[in-house]
Amino acid sequence: MTQRKIIHIDCDCFYAAIEMRDEPELAGKPLAVGGSAERRGVIATCNYEARAYGVRSAMSSRHALKLCPDLTIVKPRMEAYKEASREIHTIFRDYTDLIEPLSLDEAFLDVSDAGHFSGSATRIAQDIRRRVSNQLHITVSAGVAPNKFLAKIASDWKKPNGLFVITPDQVEDFVASLPVTKLHGVGKVTADKLGRLGIVDCADLRGRSKLALVREFGSFGERLWSLAHGIDDRPVQNDSRRQSVSVENTYDTDLPDLAACLEKLPALLETLGNRMARMEGQYRPGKPFVKVKFHDFTQTTLEQSGAGRDLGSYEQLLAQAFARGAKPVRLLGIGVRLHDLRAAHEQLELFSQ
């Protein structure tokens, strides 16, 4: 089997970088992109000058200004960011068609069969970084590795504006020293449970059998075992089929109780219906879900198999989700999981051959 060559590209503070490029007087000063503090806005991203003060994405703009009183907050210009992302992807396509976008500013590339630079993934990554810098006047960080799990870790290793390569013969030693918190899918709860078992890094994980990990963590235990051994067979998928469709709204004033939340549902449901109508014939709607973010930024999502997608069904889901926190609400969202009709059609064609 041919050794895979995967590149993970991650733009450095992308939205903020575009703003500093287009408004040079913003460069070198603490800058964030997000909503205004007066309208209960949230930080989408910030530059490294702002991060030095502790400002982070998903933080309320009001709190960010407390940490950094000189912080400049600008409104997002999504069309500018989308255009920059399109330009970057045009560069990607000069090297491979196997591109898996994760967001506007992040993507995996499989260059295993690329002929550029005699097939050197490292030189391809260097050239992509050079071209993005020259054409868009922003920087990107890149990670090169034999799989997606390691390529993503590598791109973060020398941020910002860095390149880090993990060759196949380095995988064993590199992964052994990785803390379990670096593993894809390991959040605080799983990390705490691993810690109680005396598992701090991947070397510790390797000391446990696959069966023992499955007993402790269910099917995710098998995934943990694979990652601890540097194994990740997930392909780079350039299929943009959707998993769900949703709509959400952050309110200027907290919704104080369930009744106030329920009043907002009809408008959300109307918008959701319009979005679903645009996808008719491509997807079959599945489970409905609701998302509630409380005033203290804790949030919960609830979905239910077999439930309808009418107002009454969403009201029941919202009531259950609200009860989990029973606090004032700053954001409400509703949505539907989707089943791809094109995939089902392709399967029928396959079995009919």
Swiss-Prot record:
Catalytic reactions of this protein: DNA(n) + a 2'-deoxyribonucleoside 5'-triphosphate = DNA(n+1) + diphosphate
Gene: dinB
Family: Belongs to the DNA polymerase type-Y family.
Organism, scientific name: Pseudomonas savastanoi pv. phaseolicola (strain 1448A / Race 6) (Pseudomonas syringae pv. phaseolicola (strain 1448A / Race 6))
Enzyme class: transferase
Compartments, as annotated in UniProt: Cytoplasm
Residues flagged as site, Substrate discrimination: Y15
Protein name per UniProt: DNA polymerase IV
GO CC term (a single one): cytosol
Bound cofactor: record note: Binds 2 magnesium ions per subunit.
Membrane spanning stretches: none
Pfam families recorded: IMS, IMS_C, IMS_HHH
